[in-house]
């Protein structure tokens, strides 16, 4: 049996923090559960305004943002964050592929993951965005 005790003097690696911004409570709960099982710390927000109001996006290692939300779309939120000089990697969730949104996402170097989510696609994108995960 392997020891789980930390080596004295060794750096302690913290869990990566993933923020989910999606107006569907079932999607938020499902993603939160799945990502926590993978060892991530997950913070869920019901819309862009709630996320911006929380003002803790600098502490996040990766953002998972739904495109279709009331008030502000996912790409609008990402653009707003970039204007605020937040460079946290973001992943856009999209349920209806749209060439205009895809072009904006590509220009912003934001990967798209299509809903419904199947397999490990989202997890793979998060790991690509945060290589130490």
Regions found by a protein language model. Give the residues of each.
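Short amphipathic alpha-helix used as the core "switch/output" element in two-component signaling
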Residues: 53, 75-86
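Non-catalytic signal-transmission and effector/linker regions of two-component phosphorelay proteins
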Residues: 1-19, 25-26, 32, 100, ...
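Hydrophobic/aromatic residues positioned on beta-strands within the core alpha/beta folds
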Residues: 93-95
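His-Asp phosphorelay/catalytic-motif detector in bacterial-type signaling
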Residues: 59-61, 85-89
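Active-site residues of response regulator receiver
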Residues: 66
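Acidic catalytic/metal-coordinating carboxylates
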Residues: 46-47, 73-76
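Acidic, metal-coordinating helix/loop segments flanking the phosphotransfer/catalytic sites
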Residues: 44-62
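Receiver (REC) domain active-site loop signature in two-component systems and cognate sites
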Residues: 69
């Amino acid at each position: 049996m392997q020891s789980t005790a930390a080596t004295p003097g060794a750096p302690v690696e913290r869990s990566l923090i993933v923020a989910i911004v999606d107006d569907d409570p079932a999607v938020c709960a499902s993603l939160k559960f799945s990502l926590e099982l993978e060892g991530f710390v997950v913070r869920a927000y019901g819309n862009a305004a709630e996320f911006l109001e929380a003002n803790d996006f600098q502490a996040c290692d990766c953002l998972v943002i739904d495109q279709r939300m009331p008030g502000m779309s996912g790409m609008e939120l990402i653009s707003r964050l970039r204007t605020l000089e937040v460079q946290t990697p973001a992943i856009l969730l999209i349920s209806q592929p749209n060439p205009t949104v895809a072009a904006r996402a590509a220009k912003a170097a934001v990967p798209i993951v299509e809903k419904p989510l199947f397999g490990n696609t989202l997890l793979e994108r998060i790991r690509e965005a945060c290589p130490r995960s």
